[in-house]
Amino acid sequence: MRTLIFGKGYLGTSFAASPLFRGSLLSGVDITDKAKVREEIQRYRPQVVINCAGKTNLEWCRDNKMEALEVNVAGPLFILHVCAELDLPMVHMSSGCIYEGKGAGGRGFSEKDTPDPKCFYSKSKALADELLTQAQYSKLLILRLRQPFSGASNPRNLITKVLSYQKLITSPNSMTYVPDLISATAFLLKDNQRGIFNVCNEGFISPYEIAVIAKKLFKLSQKYTPISKGELDILNAKNNREHRVDTLLNIKKLLATGFKMAKVKKRVKDALKTLSRSLP
């Protein structure tokens, strides 16, 4: 499938490197420039367009609100407009960070739950989802992922981030193994699925649990201190950092399509083993 991928960051490069999207074009054009978006799509003539572009740094979004809205909201709408004109399927990478908590009965938030964003980044992602959905384009697929990780040595990789901290929260979270996200995207496109899907691995895990597994696997001397979410909130407020959310997402809708999603703890171990091969 000839695919045009917007965004040369962690997700975009991961998609482009996958055999499932072999031959795709990875574009770094400014998605806030509608003319450039149209030119890129018309030049490459893809069969599907995937938007992985976006601003994800919470503090940057808070301090640069207009720019954050341009990239996280206006940009995806420009891509949608051109895709609709050319009758092309569009996949938009969204975020589960538009929720906080465990959802009804502790089973995680479903795609139908009303977003309750707690920081400006989350607000921009929730707004984009709302406006994209209200456009009622029949070939739109929105995927909500959460704390993406893999075996890649990349500063955006959740595992890389976790291992760089000394204090880590013990509360469980939903997380997304990037190779599984890519597989799910290919599956959903082939199955002609549309609408919003939560795409996370089965089960939940805390950042502290990841560090404990890594410490044992790598025989690390680094000490990791477990802290509560409340303690993290106090530290972030003290250091003028944006609010971080704990979020559980429900993936029943995804599983109902027939896609098989691996357990998150297994994928964390898989990612750590892959990452260990790149260590000196």
In which residue ranges do the predicted regions lie?
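N-terminal Rossmann NAD(P)H-binding glycine-rich loop of SDR-like oxidoreductase domains
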Residues: 1-19
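Active-site loop of classical SDR/Rossmann-like NAD(P)-dependent oxidoreductases
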Residues: 10, 29, 207, 227-253, ...
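NAD(P)H-binding glycine-rich loop region in Rossmannoid oxidoreductase-like domains
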Residues: 31-71
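Catalytic helix-loop patch of NAD(P)-dependent Rossmann-fold dehydrogenases
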Residues: 70, 75, 98-143, 150
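NAD(P)-dependent short-chain dehydrogenase/reductase
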Residues: 130-183
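Mid/C-terminal beta-alpha module of Rossmann-like enzyme folds, strongest
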Residues: 191-239, 276-280
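Amphipathic terminal alpha-helices
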Residues: 262-280
